[in-house]
Amino acid sequence: MGCFHSTGSEAKKRSKLIDEQLRHDHERCVGEIKLLLLGAGESGKSTIVRQMRILHETGFNKQEQMAYRPVVFSNMVQSMLAILKAMQPLNISFTDAAREEDARMFISHFLHVNNAELSEAFSLELSDLMKQLWMDEGVKKCVKRAHEYQLNDSAEYYFNALDRISSSSYLPTQDDILRARVKSTGIVETTFMYKDLCFKMFDVGGQRSERKKWIHCFDSVTAVIFCVALSEYDLRLAEDQTMNRMHESMQLFDSIVNNCWFTETSIILFLNKMDIFEERIRYTPLTVCFPEYQGGMTITETSTFIQSRFEILNKRQTPAQKEIYSHFTCATDTNNIRFVFDAVTDIIIRNNLYLCGLY
C-alpha cells in the first residue's frame, strides 16, 4: 500500500512538472503577440485601434475627447465642402434657391481657415448655415451619389447630429471618436493586455506613399490583420482617380499574403464597413467592380463573392499556411469588434502553439 502511495506521489510530481513546463513553453511561445494592421487607405484600420483602446484599455479620457473636437469639426467642414463642390459637376441643384447664397458664404468662409482655427465650437452663424444646407434635399441627393466623388463615410452621421455637435459644451462621444477621420501617417503602436497576453498592434498608413514604411514592421510578426472596406467596390482612390479601390486592395492583399516574410504568420482578413456596403449594394450593382459576377444582389451573395475573390489570391501551399481567417466586420460597432477580436485571439494562440509543436 505504501509502495503504491509512493508511486502515485511520483506520478503526480511528474505530471505537475510537465504541466509547469507546458505552461512555461506556452508563455515563451505565445507571450507577446505582435499584430500588423494593414490595408489600403480608409479601410478602417485606425478605427480598429481605437476599439482596442475602448475594449482593452480605459478608453478616452476627457482631455483626449476634447482633442477630437477639432477633428470632428474639420471632418464636417471638409465633408460639406466636398458635397457643395460636387453638386455642379453632378448636375444637382438645391431644392431651395436661397441655399445658393448659403453655399457661397460657407465656401468663402473656409477658403483661408486651417484646422487649428476649428478647435472652438462652430459659431451660431456657421452652425445655422450648415443646418440650412443639410436640410436641403439637393444636398442629400448629392450625398447619395458619394461614390462619384470623395466623401467621408462619417458625413451623414455627423450632420444628423449637428445640433449636439454645434453646442458650445460639445464633448465628442465614443461613437463620434470612432467615426473621426484622421489620415494615418507613419506607424502607430498600441499596447494592451488581453487573455493574459501582451498585444502590440501596429497601425500603418494605407495610402501608397506610406507603404514603404511597412517593411520595418515585418520582423517577428505573429499575425497580419488586413482590412478591406467592402463599401469601396464602386469608389476610386483619392490619390489615383483611375484606380478602383477594391482592385487596389486586392493587389495589395496579394502582395502581403504571398510575401516570404509571412510564411509562418497567421493572415486574418477583416471585410469591413459591412453596414455601408449593405446600404450601397441596394442601388449600385457589384458588376461595376466585378463584371464577371452573375449572382444575386443580396448582402450574403455579394459579400461572400468578394470574400472568395480575396481568398483565391492566397498561393501559400502548406496546410498550416493555406487558410485565411476571414471575418465580416463593422469597425464602428464595439460589440461586433469585441466578438470578432475574441475569435481572432483564439486563432492566433492556437496557430502559435501549433508552430511551437504544442498543439
UniProtKB/Swiss-Prot annotation:
Expressed in ASI neurons. A lipid is attached at G2 (N-myristoyl glycine). Residues 176-184 are annotated as: G2 motif. GO terms for cellular component: cilium; cytoplasm; heterotrimeric G-protein complex; non-motile cilium. A lipid is attached at C3 (S-palmitoyl cysteine). Mg(2+) binds at S46. Residues 199-208 are annotated as: G3 motif. Pfam families: G-alpha. Residues 34-47 are annotated as: G1 motif. GTP binds at residues 39-46, 178-184, 203-207, 272-275, 331. It comes from the Eukaryota. One of its GO terms (molecular function) is G protein-coupled receptor binding. Keywords: GTP-binding, Lipoprotein, Magnesium, Metal-binding, Myristate, Nucleotide-binding, Palmitate, Transducer. Belongs to the G-alpha family. G(i/o/t/z) subfamily. Guanine nucleotide-binding proteins (G proteins) are involved as modulators or transducers in various transmembrane signaling systems. Acts in concert with npr-15 to activate TGF-beta-like daf-7 secretion in the ASI neuron, thereby promoting larval development and inhibition of dauer diapause. This is Guanine nucleotide-binding protein alpha-4 subunit.
